[in-house]
From Swiss-Prot:
GO cellular component: axon; cell body; cell cortex; dendrite; neuron projection; nucleus; perikaryon; synapse
Gene, per the UniProt record: strd-1
PANTHER family the UniProt entry points to: SERINE/THREONINE-PROTEIN KINASE FRAY2, SERINE_THREONINE-PROTEIN KINASE FRAY2
Ranges where the Protein kinase domain occurs: 52-335
Lineage: Eukaryota, Metazoa, Ecdysozoa, Nematoda, Chromadorea
GO molecular function: ATP binding; MAP kinase kinase activity; protein kinase binding; protein serine/threonine kinase activator activity
Protein name in the entry: STE20-related kinase adapter protein strd-1
Traits of the deletion mutant: Ectopic expression of pre-synaptic reporter snb-1-GFP in ASI sensory neurons. Along the dorsal nerve cord of DD motoneurons, pre-synaptic puncta appear diffuse or smaller and synapse localization of sad-1 is disrupted. Germline hyperplasia and loss of aak-2 phosphorylation during dauer development. During neuroblast division, daughter cell size asymmetry in the Q.p division is defective. Animals are slightly stiff but with active locomotion. In par-4 (it33) mutants, causes embryonic lethality.
Expression by tissue: Expressed in nervous system, pharynx and excretory canal. Expressed in germline.
Primary subcellular site in the record, as a coarse category: other
Species: Caenorhabditis elegans
Gene3D superfamilies xrefs: Transferase(Phosphotransferase) domain 1
Length: 388
């Protein structure tokens, strides 16, 4: 049985990438092992023998480098190319695990793998180029005070489609956050970050595992995950992470982000629930004696719907049994309302209202300076053929 894993990457660069690596054992899925030459001046690998052109270096992410590329047979199709050095057995295993997870996924709102191969001691992963980057990128770079309600609803609807698909197959994502929500200029939303996905046991609807690497996601994790008690946690923990992520996108800041981890843990385990920041929630804060004078005018004057407040409150309910399922939330009062019922990718594009000409990947294209290289000897260790 093939051990395949997807590596997801979202980063604060114009190009957001997520790619899958497949590590073959005894199936048709496999690895192509070759030697690569990298231009020191440009940092651009020569991948022509693999069927891809690296257009230019874009940035770093998760210990790897990201390049904008194209498939040579389809010159109009841009891809994200990620390069990871294989210096650590644990890193290699983590990449393999993630690739294995993503291989199992076939959904329009989940990032897909195009191909993956190994050069010397580096893994290259190929995914579609999501040219707006991540939801985190969009908020951080262009929407300091957060996105509007309609764009939040349109994005949430696509995310719930992805989560419904996962949860119906008894998987828990466990790493949902704005950096793993990728968007393209057509308004398509794709969930990435599948390294920590876990499958529920056939006899239990909960799990008890707490991967050590999850400590990097503490601020997004549900109280029951942080508690690490005998009750375990279920797919409803993903719903909590969805609520935190939408709150962050709407408010422009990560909930609990100003707190030290121990204080954040204390507040979550004692039932404190973040809220969307608008004139209603700020008036409530003022009644409690809190100072709101430092709040920006954008927060003081905007007003979100009661239905949206209730939706996020339900996602962030301390009791996981009280949270709606992904399927139920799609027909909630907020997303089922006349205004939000039929939202789709076009609404994401319209409501974000960005200058999309700025995200035209052809503007980033340049002729990479690839040095002359000696004849390279390489061996195709396994044939690569995608699983349908």
């Amino acid at each position: 049985m093939a051990d395949t894993t997807i590596l997801d990457t979202t980063c604060s660069s114009t190009l957001a990438a997520n790619v899958e690596f497949s590590h073959a054992t005894d199936s048709a899925i496999g690895i192509s092992l070759k030697n690569a030459t990298i231009t020191e001046a440009e940092g651009v690998p020569n991948l022509k023998e693999t069927g891809y052109d690296c257009v230019r270096y874009m940035g770093t992410c998760n210990g790897g480098q990201i390049y904008l590329g194209r498939e040579r047979k389809k010159l109009k199709d841009y891809v994200a190319i990620k390069k990871f050095a294989i210096d650590d057995v644990d890193d290699y295993a983590a990449i393999a695990k993630e690739s294995s997870n993503l291989r199992l996924m076939h959904h329009p709102n989940i990032i897909e793998l195009c191909e993956c191969f190994v050069y010397e001691r580096s893994i290259y992963q190929i995914t579609p180029a999501m040219n707006l980057g991540s939801l985190f990128d969009i908020v951080f770079e262009y929407m300091k005070w957060g996105i509007n309600e309609k764009s939040a609803a349109a994005i949430t609807r696509q995310l719930l489609d992805a989560l419904s698909y996962l949860h119906q197959r008894r998987y828990i994502h466990r790493d949902l956050k704005p950096k793993h929500i990728l968007i393209d200029s057509s308004g398509n939303v794709k969930l990435s970050g599948f390294r920590f996905m876990i499958e529920l046991n056939h006899h239990l609807d909960c799990v008890f595992e707490f991967d050590a690497h999850l400590q990097n996601q503490l601020y997004y994790l549900a109280p029951e995950v942080l508690a690490q008690n005998i009750h375990g946690y279920t797919s409803k923990s993903d719903i909590y992470m969805l609520g935190i992520s939408i709150c962050e996108a709407i408010n422009g800041v990560m909930p609990f982000g100003e707190l030290e981890p121990l204080e954040m843990l204390h507040r979550k385990l004692n039932g404190q629930v973040p809220r969307p920041v608008d004139m209603i929630s700020l008036k409530d804060d003022q009644k409690m004696g809190l100072d709101i004078s430092h709040r920006p005018q954008e927060h003081l004057t905007r007003r979100f719907s009661k239905e949206m407040h209730e939706f996020i409150a339900n996602c962030l309910d301390y009791d996981p049994q009280q949270r709606g399922s992904a399927s139920d939330l799609k027909s909630s009062a907020w997303l089922g309302s006349k205004i939000h019922k039929n939202l789709g990718p076009v609404d994401v594009r319209q409501e974000l209202n960005l200058d999309y000409a700025h995200f035209d990947l052809s503007l980033w294209e340049q002729e990479p300076l690839i040095p002359m290289e000696p004849d390279q000897k390489y061996e195709i260790v396994f044939d690569y053929s995608p699983i349908s």
